[in-house]
């Protein structure tokens, strides 16, 4: 049966409503627990050992940007590994960064990259199927086998990986960690939403 009004996020389990800013953190945790139970499943905590190595770098767009391939590792014995493609302005200082989960074989177009650079932003993309298949086989992929015992599906797995991209950005000297965005297309949009629910950065 369809609902005609969106649920009230400020309605607490006891029937009262959040009235102050101080009450919100507890309500947020309640909502996250509901989403974990009914929608996303359980997922492992941040591994704490995320690292990134630049394996390729060159100037692009007539020298006004730098393109890099970044190999990210994390998890027990660095069992989780995947590659990202980064475009960033070739200038000193910190810049906002867009993190973009992509489908296999898809990357930002030159027009999209040019628009990002014109705003002074960086963009870092990764193909999410490196971590989990876009099918029922996700439960047999690299993340699921590295972290057994969790009830997550592909959406949560990809979202967890998008947060590991943010872990890497935090180790760089160019990412403005107060201006990080998660995005994706179609199911990728659901992934970005999941990532931002569980990662407050």
Where are these regions (language model features)?
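Acidic, low-complexity proline/glycine-rich segments
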Residues: 1-6
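Non-catalytic accessory segments flanking enzyme active sites
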Residues: 7-90
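C-terminal His-loop and adjacent cap/lid subdomain of alpha/beta-hydrolase
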Residues: 92, 194
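Cap/lid segment of the alpha/beta-hydrolase catalytic domain
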Residues: 93-94, 98-174, 183
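Residue in the alpha/beta-hydrolase core beta-strand immediately N-terminal to the catalytic nucleophile
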Residues: 179-181
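Gly/Ala-rich beta-loop-alpha elbow adjacent to hydrolase catalytic centers
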Residues: 184-188, 192
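Conserved hydrolase catalytic core segment
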Residues: 197-201
